[in-house]
């Protein structure tokens, strides 16, 4: 029995999709040989399931509820709750006689409102998560910037110390100097870890083990002579591994403890950190293990429901396996951390294309390095930008102020003294047109001689090392290691120039000098500039008009709305403040009460508006991933293929095609177990016919082999 006609309709509509017209085609209906064994009418005895709101999917938001207590969302909310509707689907909710112009206008308005609602929903869902607060909340973001500035100033001090000692004059950023480059990186790490001079000397005296050094030896000795030397080393290592497995761990530990390992660490990679888990909670767990140094956490990853990843760093002389097991034995927020041992970096010096040593390429790279240096000095607030406010520095960058001319970094002046005056001067577009060096000028030569200018490369190397040490920018990899000070390797690797280019198009002239195609050089410069621009320089800004469209909030209006929310009229000359529970004679008394007794709440409302506006102002703001649309199946009656065959998931059976809700493609509500997919059977269609939509084999051709050749 049902209480009303509406409930009866809802009950009948529950399995409406199982009684499609398509299910009754070809005389099969929704029945198959399994359905005949089930008593009819059994389905109607089941209790009707409670409806579920459309927005109660795998998002972070609760089910929308209307004012009458129903679980169904209101009409105004449901249109913005799910994914963005297509124009065709949007038109189904409009009047039939709507004009094309009005339809496009309303659809654009719908898209704007949908985007605004989605951003608001995302903000409410994630505003209490730590990674989101550190990124956009004014107070937390300020603390993070101050900590970053402190780390950069420490790195600048280390750079100046090594420069005064002449450490950067011992090598060039070429792959052949890999050993000296690794020594320099180790020196940086020791000083960042506040190591003493004795520890630094001990580290520099140790033998280096790196794959880049092995590659250099192979190039020097040849492939044939190096292989016999490697075999006994491998056997010795395998023997050492066997001893460790048999229980001789203490010997290895004693040997490693005699070395100075201040520049080396062990680390654990945490693959599964819930978004609600804080840094302090995870750090407290890691501190229970001996030798803990630091912890690094990433931002929430949209593709993983904003779970984070992390690296816990420990001293080198501890048993990292036991620590990893201990971390996996704990569950935080009912979640396994899935910790694994992080592998060491085995190749600390990596190569870029050797054409980077060519003079024309080096001049281009030098200009880019100068631009990056002054830009990141300005961003972080070094030298003359130290006394400027964050907003003023950002405005100068956005307005395109000449940062090179305004920079007081002494390194820029030193670089200018190392190269000719005209090398760093960019000519204007008008001057380029007059000189004929623009696109319309004389065509360049097909091939040019490979030329190397040591003075330009020396100036370039100084800037690249500065960027790598101070700002954690790997120039030749066009990458910024933003969290390097919290990572296991604080200055782990660097990319340098490789060997001179070789190939079919690279030839030599009569003097034996390399000759390279001009187009190859131009293409390399163009591609490198593009990657540097996109990866390190370019920043997208959101206009004020766009912010207003996305729902930018006014702090004072939010405060006023908070006051109005806490001003409730009970009767004539009787008003209530829900925040404190006190009653007043008029609304003006409540306003004074809130401004005097609850000023912190008003500041929270104002700060919440700034918090939300900071999120909107980020052009690369995180958003929820759009759900992937399932491929449409045009064969609705057959049920074969993906949507009607064996092995279909129960959730997938709700969609069109396949003829019903069971995994066999029949029309009944079947609770039989699902079988593994059997592609050879295709699927069992709604019409009860097997192999209907399965891929068909080529028909066999029957031919009389004894027939004459002229008869087909």
Swiss-Prot record:
GO biological process: primary miRNA processing
GO CC annotation, single: nucleoplasm
Biased composition (Acidic residues): 240-251
Biased composition (Gly residues): 656-668
Membrane-spanning intervals of the chain: none
Region ranges (Disordered): 1-80, 214-256, 620-712
Domain of life, per lineage: Eukaryota
Feature: compositional bias, Polar residues: 65-79
Location of this chain's protein in the cell: Nucleus
Cited PANTHER family: ARSENITE-RESISTANCE PROTEIN 2, SERRATE RNA EFFECTOR MOLECULE HOMOLOG
Protein name, as recorded: Serrate RNA effector molecule homolog
Source organism (scientific name): Caenorhabditis elegans
